[in-house]
Regions:
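ATP-dependent carboxylate-amine ligase catalytic core
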Residues: 1-77, 93-95
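Acidic, Mg2+-coordinating active-site environments of NTP-dependent enzymes
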Residues: 34, 56-64, 79-200
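Catalytic core of IPPT-family isopentenyl/dimethylallyl transferases
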Residues: 204-208
Length: 212
């Protein structure tokens, strides 16, 4: 939205322009050596991001798919945990024009024996696809328990809520952001990330320039 560097961050800080330019040059050389000129901008950016995360020696990397998941370039990653957020009609020209077809692509990030966290409240046809994939790959399917959520306060700028007895604060408002946060909380539980780090991470999470 503001600059291309915002799409690659470590600890909330954008990749610097010099670092981006350096890695862009390295990826360009690798691309030229393949002799293939059909790589998309997102595929190039994904390669730059993965190389940057490797050089920065990150402990945990959050990798977001570009379109769908099944055929997405991010699917080269072997995840510690997979997260499927809200499935709705998006990129229908590529993913299909039914929720079941779109869900099939989204479920493409599910890997054998890797825990999969699913955004709560999905449509039944979406859940059928995801459930089947999780059973096929023998992976734990985790859906945040909305009955364990207690709303403490919500206004246009802040949300305070508790989940499973632990308090959290968001600066992104809306019920959907709470559900997104629950997915993040469950992912952090799988990764054994301590509560204080989860609380701070959620409190500092923001999407600049997404609302005016």
């Amino acid at each position: 939205i503001e600059c291309i560097e915002e799409r690659i961050q470590v600890n909330g800080k954008y990749i610097s322009r010099p670092a981006f330019a350096l890695l862009c040059g390295q990826v360009k050389k690798a691309v030229e050596q393949t002799g293939f000129d059909g790589f998309s901008q997102f595929e190039i950016l994904c390669a730059i991001a993965l190389l940057y995360f490797y050089k920065e020696q990150v402990n945990v990397a959050v990798i977001e798919t570009g379109i769908g998941g099944l055929l997405d370039c991010t699917n080269v990653v072997n995840p510690a945990v997979s997260v499927i957020t809200s499935v709705d009609f998006d990129h229908t020209d590529v993913l299909g024009d039914t929720l079941a077809e779109i869900a099939r692509h989204k479920a493409g990030i599910i890997k054998p024996s890797v825990p999969c966290i699913v955004y709560p409240g999905q449509a039944k046809e979406v859940m059928r696809v995801i459930d089947d994939k999780c059973r096929e790959y023998n992976c734990e399917e985790i859906i945040p328990d909305m009955s364990r959520v207690q709303m403490l306060h919500m206004d246009i700028t802040d949300v305070f809520f508790s989940y499973k007895g632990m308090n959290y604060h968001l600066v992104m408002s809306g019920e959907h952001q709470i559900k997104n946060a629950l997915c993040a909380i469950e992912a952090c539980r799988i990764l054994n990330i301590e509560y204080s780090s989860v609380f701070t991470g959620l409190e500092r999470s923001a999407l600049r320039a997404r609302m005016e």
